[in-house]
Amino acid sequence: MEEYLITARSVTQAQRMAQLLERRGVRAVVGRVPMGLTGKGCGYVLRLRGREKAVAAWGLLREMGFSPAQVFQRWDDGYSEVEL
């Protein structure tokens, strides 16, 4: 299944976003940014399984006033930034 990563500005923001999504029925797991993904050193992401969940999460986060920075899709050979 496809995996999507939505970047967060801090661990606190990632945790808040995950909690709000959970309340809306969208499961997201908070994790560290994979090495070399953003070029900004350490960071946190929400991991979601499947494009449908990623699109739903992106819309809900924007609706709730969050401004997630980037979305990446995981491929066998790495990650690429995508638009939802």
Question: Predicted regions span which residues?
Answer:
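Amphipathic, hydrophobic secondary-structure cores in small proteins
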Residues: 2-5, 9-22, 26-56
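C-terminal structural segments of small proteins and small subunits
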Residues: 50-84
